[in-house]
Amino acid sequence: MSAPSRAEDAPRIAAIDRAMEQQIEQHEIAGAVTLVATQNSILHLSAVGEADIANHKPMKTDSLFWIASMTKPITATAIMMLEEQGKLSVDDPVSKYIPQLAHLKTQDGVEHVVTLKHLLTHSSGMAEASSAEAHSSKNLEQLIAHYTERPLLFAPGSKWQYCQAGINTLGRVIEIVSGQSYPDFLQQHLFTPLGMKDTTFYPTQEQADRLAVSYKRAGDQLEPAPIAMFGGAPLTSHDRYPAPNGGLFSTAPDYCRFCQMIINEGTLNGHQYLKRETVEKMTSIQSGDLKSGFTPGNGWGLGWCIVREPQGITAMLSPGTHGHGGAYGTQAWIDSKADRIYILMVQRADFPNSDASPTRLAFQQAATH
């Protein structure tokens, strides 16, 4: 990836900066980092607004963000790496690796087989753990134990329903199959070789000092909103499980490296992470005709939302564009047909639908015109 030598020297697209400044003026966000890239270069990288309003801290291009569910495609990538190594198949029943999940039943008492593919496509029917159960779990093994206690919500494969439990279970499968902890596997096989030095479940103090504050609306202003997922624990604390469904922190340039590996069909800077056919499988619709995603016209791949019929918030994207959002408004979308990657980093806790936020719409419209 050809990156600017210094962030402040990065190329900028004025229309994107103006669009984000307008979002700040309308109190939608405090600040934003935006990035537009191709397969091998950055076309735009910019920070506008503030990372911390009270302390007048400007947003910077290396500001750290809780990327929440943008963790999910990374978890899926790790699963596909293990499939390529011959250590698992996405068609395997999850019970092959976690025997406690062997006899899952729907409410009517019928037993069903849940496969890894069901987990990757949010079609497993697995029920969630409670917030209290999640916060009390110190590792993935403890967390997954809670999933065995509940009936399936529907027959696997019959419906799409966004499922944190399924993705978290995949994280535990990664540990069992690889013999490494989930964070160690990601660090060794993705973050270190890709140069994603600021992508972590457990920020250092230096990284935490760069974290953009999360905000929610209070009338026509913004007020701080702590990250609920972590239950008030210090972000630097290791006393929590590394959440495969949404525990990562990252920066726009870091996440771009991951996206460039995907848009380059599994290879970046001469290092092959995945085979081309594996990336094609991940980023093509695997959910059939099931109504999928949080905005109209989408399907689901293996860990990725896929734009089936561009419309509304996706109208400016090509069919087949794939990406994922995060709970606090972060977004990353890969339009392979146009050779474009679009990354938006913001921290807004109360967007009614972060995938359909006015900030995402403004960014994508400015970035594609």
Placement of each model-derived feature along the sequence:
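Extracytoplasmic/secreted envelope proteins and their assembly/folding machinery
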Residues: 13, 17, 21, 33, ...
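Short active-site loop at a secondary-structure junction
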Residues: 22-35, 54-118, 154-165, 243-246
